[in-house]
Amino acid sequence: MVSFTVQDRKLSEIEQKEIDDRVILWAKNKNFIFMMSSLHQIIWSNSSWEIVHHFNLVNNDNEIGLAKRKALLALHPDKQHGASAEQKYLATRLFSVIKQEWDIYIRKKEV
């Protein structure tokens, strides 16, 4: 008999869409700094992510870069050992969005 754990379960298209919608709503109209300072609002409670306060990021490129690196480490798809299917999918989506928004943030700073 084969037994499956919660981590082995695949998400349905409906479950994926619900997570996608949450990520879109969370990211909507936010710049990169606001995304980093609000990541705790969407990430699961027992993740390795530590809250980053907005006032620590404003005009502080070192803190912004550090927050980005910590977020990508916490969300990296290969680092989701023991996470549920929902957490893995959410991590993958957030990882992608944060990478995209970081690229936009860097391009705007270069102008």
Q: What kind of feature is each model-predicted range?
A:
Residues 1-10:
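Eukaryotic long, low-complexity intrinsically disordered regulatory regions enriched in serine/proline
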Residues 9-111:
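N-terminal J-domain/J-like co-chaperone modules of DnaJ/Hsp40 proteins
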